[in-house]
Every structure is written in structure tokens, then in C-alpha cells.
Amino acid sequence: MFESLRVPVIAAPMAGGPSTPELVTSVVRAGGFGFLAGGYLTAATLADQIHKTRELAGESFGVNLFVPGVRSLVDVTSYADRLRGEADRYGVAPGAGRWDDDGYAAKLDLVVERRVPVVSFTFGTPLVADIERLHEAGVTVVVTVTTPDEAREAATAGADVLCVQGFEAGGHRAVFTDDASSDSGGPLLGLLSALRLIGAETDLPLVAAGGLVHGADVAATLSAGAVAAQLGTAFLRADEAGTNGTYRAALDAGGRQTAITRAFSGRPARGLENRFLRENSAAAPAAYPQLNNITKPVRAAATAAGDPEAVSLWAGQTYPLTESGPAERIVARLAEQAREAVSAAARRFG
């Protein structure tokens, strides 16, 4: 599947708005591949996006789903109380700290029914029975992993491809189990190290993800054993991305460091530092998606007000190097940069 791409670049699934059928289509037209983000969407909305993407891009697309985790028993009441002042600032109340499975079963049924060409999973490995259902429908199954242990689990369950995520990545870390004793939720492996270590454990094709915004980055991951590179942050400012105006303005302005935090969702995720992140990270428990539901009204109100200080501004470490413009142009530039990087490296070795 990914080995045959004319340009080995994949538009990563970015839940919450940035991933759109138009973004996927633009990347596909440039020779790459694109994912829709099923996370946080209803099955009906996802069905509409699948239909539209198929009309525009044919079969060169996939859908990403979040694997439901074990229900956390952590009491999130005190965290909700802590945020009342922040919520008052925007004239809203904190949301209910409920657990849910993001409509996983309905969305899994949908991608099987629609025979989506590729389905990727984040936050764990789906049940073997679910993978078998997908295979029976002709679906290629991708599991996102961060460590060799996770890679072995995914391979044993029947995954066809592993998406290897380095700690440089923007958005949620894909760790299978969120280790509450660690601010990062688990071991922090850089992308190239993770590719080498996981590549030594399996013969499955590897897709590289994590802080990739330049063609030289893409070339480096291919040299480290990946068959393609998956980029999210690089496309956040693309014309076709659904990145909201407040989010775009913060990316355009630059000047902020990135940090990993549980403050917004209860799961470790990398984003631009802002007031909410600084003031609440230390107090945020490992309770996903309860915290995501608690903070949702605050994030929505801050976004509507154009205030980036209480919005989850997910982005990888290298976000200052991103550019705006059509996604096709971004992919073409990545390809040219990769070719130049390979040629320059070859010259260094005579």
C-alpha cells in the first residue's frame, strides 16, 4: 500500500477539525496519501466525510479511530472545580467529567461496511476479532506504536503496518497505557531511535511520525527503515486544513515553546505553551477522556473569543518551520527537499 506511493508522504489524522476531505484530496493529488480523523466525530459525520473523500480522492485514503481505554477510576471532581474560574472567564461552565468510548463500535462498523481502504488505530491495539473483521472486508490495518513492546503486541494481534510515533510529535502521544507516574505517559523515544529499535523487532512495514516538517526529515526516516512518513503539523497551516482561526493565528505568530501536558484531555499530548497549560498541567490527573469532556466548553469558548490562552494548540516540536499554502505545494516542496537532502548526503560520501 504505502510502498507504492509516488511521494511517500501521508497526511496524518488530526482530530478536532484540521483533517478534512479537502486536505486528504490535495495530498493524494500530489502523490501522497491521507487520513481522515474519526476521533470525536459521530459515526454519521464520519460517514459523510468518507463519502466526500471517496468522491474526491478515490481509494487513496484511510480513517483513524481511537481505541477505547480502560475506564479511569480517578475522581476528577477537584479538577473540574479548579477550572471554574477559567470557565467563568469565558462565561461557561466546565463540562461533565464523564467517561465514554467515542462511539467506537458504531465507527468500527462503519469503516467495515464502507470498506475503507486503510484504518489506523491510536491508543492501543484493537481486539483480534476486530482486526479479523477488517481483514475480511479487505481493509489494511495500521496500529500506532511508540515502543518495541507495543509493536510486538500490535504485530501479534495481526496489524499489517505499524505507524511509529516519536516523542517529537504534536498532539496526543499514542501510548497504549498512560503511565500516571510519568508526565509523558511512558518512555520517550525519539523517532529515529524508535524506528531502529522497532525495525529490529518486526518485518512489518513502518510508517514514521513525529515532528516531521521538512523533506530532509522524510528522507532521514526512509533511511532509518520507514516506507513512508506521516506528517500532521506540517499541514496544520495548509489552505485545505480545518484548523480554526485562533489555532492558525497562534501557529502563524510562533514564539511559543511546545510541551507535553495532560491539562486539556487527561492524556499526554504535545502542544504550544499557553496560560491554561502552564497553570493546570501539574494538577491534571491521568483521566482520559473525562478531562477532555470537562475542558471542552472552555476550549470552545476561548476559540470563539479568539483567545489562544485556553485552547489546546497541538503541534510538534518543529512547528516554527511550517508554511501556509495549498497542501499540494507543501507536498511538492517536501519531495524536492528530500531529493536535495539525499543528493547532498551522497556527495558527502563521495
What are these regions, as identified by a protein language model?
Residues 169-207, 212-350:
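Conserved active-site-proximal phosphate/metal-binding subdomains
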Residues 1-201, 334:
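Active-site entrance/lid segments in N-terminal catalytic domains of soluble metabolic enzymes
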